[in-house]
Amino acid sequence: MTHAPKSSPQDDSVSVRAAVNIDIPALVRLINAAFIVEQFVFDDDRISAEEARAFMETGKFLVAHDSVGFAACVYVELRNDRGYLGLLAVDPERQGTGLGRKLVGVAEDYFRGEGCCAVDLRVISQRTPLPPFYRRLGYVEIGTAPFAPSLQSKVPGHYIIMSKPLA
């Protein structure tokens, strides 16, 4: 089986907008497909429709889409003078095309526009490629935090907390 070469997000006419309630089923499919790589850590899906609705009450999802559908999304939330970025998910068929980097940049621009002085995020320690990815985007590790007691992790781990000042 051969795969078509991955194209850059600029070639795909990808645009970004805030998700609305009708987008929840597509968001859930995208996030769970992208986070399937975490099944060695957690058994359950990464997000349910109910959880996505709850996230949309405190923040918003920015979605990158094109004529094919949703290509990527990221959750953004204002927390006083800081932004919180989470659930960065890129369609597995489009990973490695720069969409994740593009969407992080859009999220940072959103936070700047809201007057935030920094962006915070957290990744699970078992996803070893993630800290270097975020470091390349200017984020630094500022600490760790335990998983919530309700999360049943199959392997030991913790959150790595990262932050980036916004100019």
Give the location of each predicted region:
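A generic structural signal for beta-strand entry/edge sites
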Residues: 80-82, 118, 159
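Conserved glycine-rich acetyl-CoA-binding loop
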Residues: 91-105, 114, 125-132, 136
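Residues at secondary-structure transition points
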Residues: 43, 47, 98, 125, ...
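Conserved catalytic-core motifs of GNAT/GCN5-like acyltransferases
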Residues: 120-124, 131, 135, 140-157
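Terminal substrate-recognition subdomain of acyl/acetyltransferases
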Residues: 2-7, 153-167
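Conserved GNAT acetyl-CoA-binding A-motif
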Residues: 111-123
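Acetyl-CoA-dependent GNAT
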Residues: 3, 9, 21-24, 28-93, ...
